[in-house]
Structures are given as structure tokens and as C-alpha cells.
Amino acid sequence: MSEFFKTVPVVKYEGADSSNPFAFKHYDANKMLMGKTMAEHLRVAVCYWHTFCWQGSDVFGANTFDRPWSKAASEMEAAKLKTDAAFEFFTKLGVPYYSFHDVDVSPEGRSIKEYINNFAQMVDVLQAKQEATGIKLLWGTANAFSNPRYMSGAASNPNPEIFAYAATQVFHAMNATKALKGENYVLWGGREGYETLLNTDLKRERAQLGRFMQMVVEHKYKIGFEGTLLIEPKPAEPTKHQYDYDTATVYGFLKEFGLEKEIKVNIEANHATLAGHSFHHEIATACSLGILGSVDANQGDAQLGWDTDQFPTSVEEYTLVTYEILKSGGFKTGGYMFDTKLRRQSMDLEDLFHGHIGAMDTLALSLERAVKMIEDEKLANIVDQRYAKWNDSLGADILAGKHTLQDLAEYAEKNNIDPQPVSGRQEMLENMVNGYIFK
């Protein structure tokens, strides 16, 4: 078997004073925090597509990467070489998990039968790699957006045969995820949306998408898949408008089709900002609704209006996000999955390590600071105090449904109430949080 990353040693934790570019400065997998190791809290995963499939092209230019695992006599041989490279990378980096789309790991072929046969062979290859290395699958998914057949959608397509083709891919991708002991299955509707309303029946397409998701849930129970089903929100790109716009939109969709107890969300940082929200907002919203499943850890560029999928470097942002996750009990089956890609000019194989090492150190620093915020309870206590009156008889009775509008109007008049505003102390709280982050 070829060694693809000969110049890179196994990446180890060396501490903040290390000058070794191939060492973690802050990510110490075995460090104990709140009763768990750092690795158990973060559950880090590497994505297959950007890391091993993307060749550095963009809409204005051709490939800039020259990946040795792409040079093979056949597509299947290239897929197997890619698997060798991937698991060498996972092992040297020391991550516990990875994730993939079906066509990341297997050639699509020239027919649906070739697709099925190729994928089945590659699942066996992946299974052997997992057993040999101990690397686990965080989640699997099907790519129902890249092939031209999906230009008008997959589940929302006007043609039911394309719906059936997408169903075939999801059927086999779910089965593969179960066979590989994956802990989640993700559904991202990259083409589930519209370019123009002039040729779009919104009600019909939403009904099609709802039925597709119901079928996914049915299949989960049929095959005994014990992982979590996840929808990944995104407002646009590649379509003008996607139906899974943001967390709140997805929750409304799930409620409409009776799926709110069956499917959670996989939040991506860059998707949140494209929707006009902060990453913190989307995580907090998902946690408040009880539907946070997993996180695609990356960041966008504030000056650009598209999905740049950069490696996360903001400890400020990820401290607040990790704080929300810890408040809600931490990850169960999900984790921080790096949906990240190098910049086109970062051509060297070593750059893959630099990007992931920095991202893992960012998560480690953020976790340590979020844990301190949880343990000190200062922020939580201030929030509790802000809403304390809702625990008194009036507030509790309102929420319990014991009062009508008329009751409250009579109460206000009888008691001549004159409630006064109280400072929200935002600036003080921001200073407090900075004290944790920059200490």
C-alpha cells in the first residue's frame, strides 16, 4: 500500500509553547473536562469530499491540486487509492471519525446498476479500513445534487422517476451507513428549492419533499438503523432559494409532516451566516427546540456572499457555540465535522494537515473556555435572574393557561401596575465573556 503523506509524522499534542507545525498546541484528546475527555466532547470528524475529492477548481478556473490518489488505471482503483490516502490521513491526524457522500467513496458508474455494484464493493473496503484503524463513521449521506439529472431537484423534482432515482441512492447510502455503524445519516437538499417561481408549484414540491422524508424515517425503522437522522439547513446556493432555509424553517417543515420527533438538524456555520443569522443563533435555536444533532464546523468570509467552507479559526465564535451545546447536554450521536476545504493556492499535501490541526486547536480552546463558563455559572445565573418573575405566581399561572387576556387586563387595572424596565447589561455581559475567552 502506498504512503501518501510521507513528510508528515503522527500528529501529537505538544502544548502551547511548541513551534512544531505538525503538533497540536491545545487539542489534547485525553484531557478531562466535566467528566469527559476532550475527544469525547468534540467528536471530531474529517469530511471525504473537500479533503480527498475536490481538486482545487472553481467557477473561474481549473484544478490546481495534483493528488496522487487520483492517478489510477480505473475509477474503482482510484476509489481504493483514495481510501488508502483518507485512512492514512485520519490515522496520522488522530481523529476518531469521518463522513462521506456515496459518490465520494465510489464511482457513480454509467448506470444505476453500476452505481449499486460499485458502492457495495467500496462499503466492503471501508469496513475493512475501519476495522484495521478503529476510525468510525460519524455520518453518511447521498449526493443527490451534483449529477445533471438533479438540476431541478431530487425529491422536489417535477419528474417522479428522478424522485425514484434519488430514493435509490438514499436507500443504498442509508444501508451503507448502517453496515458501517455510522452514528447519523444526513440529508442536505442542495437542489431542493427553486430558481424562479414562474415554473414552480411550491405546495406540490413541499409535499413531495415531506413524503420523501417520511419514507426515509420508515426505512430507518425497517432496517433497524439506530443512528440519528439529520437535515442540514442552507438558504441558497446552488439554488436561488432552498426549502431547508434555516433551523426555524426546517422545524416548521418537520412539524407539518409529523417528523419533529424523528429528525434533527446538522448546523453548518457558513450556512447560518448565509441565512442572515449568526452561527450562535442557529445553534441556540436548535438547542432550544431540542433538535440539535450535529455541527459542520467551518467559517465563511464576512466580505463574501457565498459558502467558502474555510477552516474555523475564531475562538470567540466557537466558545459561544460550544457553550450552548454543553448547556443542552453536549453531543449525543453528533460531533464537530469539518466541512472545510483548502484555499486553491494551498496546493501541498501538508496543507491538509495545517488546516485541520489549526481547526482542532480552535475547537479545543473554545471547549476549555466554554467549560469554564458552564462551571462558573455566572452567565447562567444572570439569565435566570432576568426571568425570575416568571417563576412567581403570576408568570407561572400565565404559562399554565390559567389566565385570559381579560383576566390580565382586570389584574393590571385593579393593581394599577406600573412595571419599570430593567437594564439588559449587554456590555457587561460581553466583557464577562471576553474575560473567559482571552484569559
UniProtKB/Swiss-Prot annotation:
Its cofactor is Mg(2+). GO terms for molecular function: magnesium ion binding; xylose isomerase activity. The active site is at residues 101, 104. It catalyses: alpha-D-xylose = alpha-D-xylulofuranose. Its EC number is 5.3.1.5. Its main location: cytoplasm. Binds 2 magnesium ions per subunit. Mg(2+) 2 binds at residues 268, 271, 307, 309. One of its GO terms (cellular component) is cytoplasm. Mg(2+) 1 binds at residues 232, 268, 296, 339. InterPro entries: Xyl_isomerase-like_sf, Xylose_isom_bac, Xylose_isomerase. The keyword Hydrolase does not apply. One of its GO terms (biological process) is D-xylose metabolic process. It is found in: Cytoplasm. Keywords: Carbohydrate metabolism, Cytoplasm, Isomerase, Magnesium, Metal-binding, Xylose metabolism. Belongs to the xylose isomerase family. Homotetramer. This is Xylose isomerase. It comes from Marinomonas sp. (strain MWYL1).
